[in-house]
């Protein structure tokens, strides 16, 4: 845990911008922050450039009692699907 953060959830919807999701997840985890990629509509989500990403969990599995931050990556279709 870093900076008092318990959990950060990165919401991934079909068409999300891959670099806007994967790079922040990587950097936050390197800093010791707990980050989970959350798939909207399944665990395997396809980004805006056709790259499939396997989420850590699906939307219904989020523990909101531990939530500190939700991150929404860009991508027109990804944002619309969230």
Residues covered by each model-derived region:
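Extended, subdomain-level signal for the structured scaffold at the beginning of enzyme domains
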Residues: 1-82
